[in-house]
A protein has these predicted regions:
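Beta/alpha (TIM)-barrel catalytic core signal, keyed to glycine-rich beta->alpha loops juxtaposed to Asp/Glu
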Residues: 134-260
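Short, acidic/polar
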Residues: 31-44, 105-121, 165-170
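Alpha-helix N-cap and loop-to-helix initiation/capping positions
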Residues: 32-36, 62, 66, 101-109, ...
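Acidic (Asp/Glu)-rich catalytic clusters
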Residues: 12-14, 46, 70-82, 118-122, ...
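Structural motif corresponding to the early beta-alpha repeats
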Residues: 78-105
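Conserved, mostly hydrophobic/aromatic
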Residues: 20, 37, 52, 67, ...
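N-terminal binding-site loop/beta-alpha segment at the start of enzyme catalytic domains
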Residues: 2-82
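Active-site groove signature of glycoside hydrolases
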Residues: 118-137
C-alpha cells in the first residue's frame, strides 16, 4: 500500500462504522450530568461504537472538558476508543468573549486549540484532527508545516477536513495527507451525491464522514419528509427496521464507504 492508503486503512480499522457525535451532549443540547455522560459513553461502547466526534467549540468550549471528565470515570480504556476533534472556528461565548465569529488557522491558534483539546479530553493524542470549516484566508503552507510537526510530535495521528470542497482540499496539498472529509450528507440533504464531493473523495482515496446523517427527517415536515415517510414505512415492514436504521443504511450503501 502507498502511504496515503496505509494511513486510511489504519484509520478505518480504528474507527467504528458508526461514529458518535457529541455536539448535543452538553450545553448545546441534552446538558447531561457527568454521571449521565459516563453512562452514555459506556453504553455507546457496548453497542460497538468506539469513535467519538468532538469540536473545540461545542457547548461554547465546554463539552470537550465535560466529556473528558466523564470518560475518566468510565470503564472504557483510552486505547479502546478513537477521539476526533475539530478546530479553526473562533466562536464568541462566555468562555471566549470575542467580538465576532471568525476562522483562525494560524500556527499559533492550531497549537493553542489542540493543546486545549488534549487537556480537556484528558488524553495525550487525538486520533484525527479536522479543520472545521474552510477559511478564505487560510495559509496552506503554514497549515502544512504546523500539522506535520504536530504529527511528528505524536499529538495527532491523522489529519483531515470538514466541509471542504475538492478545490479547497487541493489547495492544502498532499503533505500531510488529507485522509478524511466530514461533510453534510443524508437522505434529506443529498448535495454531496451530485456536487462532486463524494466523487472526489473516492478518486483521491479520502475517507468520508457524514455529519447530521439523519438530516431533517425527524425535525421538519416539508415536502421532502412528506414524500419520504410513506416510503420508509413500507421499508420498515420489509426489513423489520426502524426509520433511523434505514436512513443510516441508505448512507452506508454508498460506494464512498460513508461513516455516519
Amino acid at each position: 500500500l502507498d502511504g496515503k492508503k496505509k494511513v486510511k486503512k489504519q484509520m478505518k480499522s480504528k474507527f467504528s462504522r458508526i461514529i458518535s457525535g457529541t455536539m448535543t451532549w452538553g450545553q448545546w443540547g441534552k446538558q447531561l450530568s457527568e454521571k449521565e455522560m459516563t453512562g452514555l459513553i459506556e453504553t455507546t461502547y457496548e453497542l460497538g461504537i468506539n469513535t467519538f466526534d468532538h469540536a473545540d467549540i461545542y457547548g461554547g468550549y465546554t463539552t470537550e472538558a465535560e466529556f473528558g471528565a466523564a470518560f475518566a470515570q468510565s470503564a472504557v480504556a483510552r486505547e479502546q476508543v478513537a477521539f476526533i476533534t475539530k478546530c479553526g472556528i473562533q466562536y464568541p461565548s462566555d468562555a471566549r468573549p470575542l467580538k465576532v465569529k471568525h476562522y483562525d488557522y494560524t500556527p499559533e491558534h492550531l497549537r493553542f486549540s489542540l493543546s486545549n483539546s488534549l487537556q480537556n479530553l484528558q488524553t495525550d493524542y487525538i486520533d484525527l484532527l479536522l479543520l472545521h470549516r474552510p477559511s478564505p484566508l487560510m495559509d496552506a503552507a503554514a497549515i502544512h508545516n504546523t500539522l506535520e510537526t504536530l504529527m511528528k510530535e505524536g499529538k495527532i495521528r491523522a489529519f483531515g477536513v470538514s466541509n471542504f470542497t475538492p478545490s479547497q482540499i487541493d489547495l492544502l496539498g498532499t503533505k500531510p495527507q488529507v485522509t478524511w472529509n466530514q461533510i453534510e450528507c443524508s437522505l434529506t440533504h443529498t448535495d454531496a451525491l451530485t456536487n462532486g464531493d463524494l466523487d472526489y473523495c473516492q478518486t483521491h482515496d479520502i475517507g468520508v464522514m457524514a455529519w447530521s446523517p439523519l438530516g431533517s427527517y425527524f425535525k421538519d415536515d416539508n415536502p421532502t419528509q412528506q414524500r419520504l415517510r410513506p416510503l420508509l414505512k413500507e421499508l420498515q415492514k420489509t426489513y423489520a427496521a426502524t426509520e433511523d436504521q434505514l436512513l443510516l443504511a441508505w448512507l452506508m450503501q454508498h460506494q464512498a464507504t460513508i461513516y455516519p
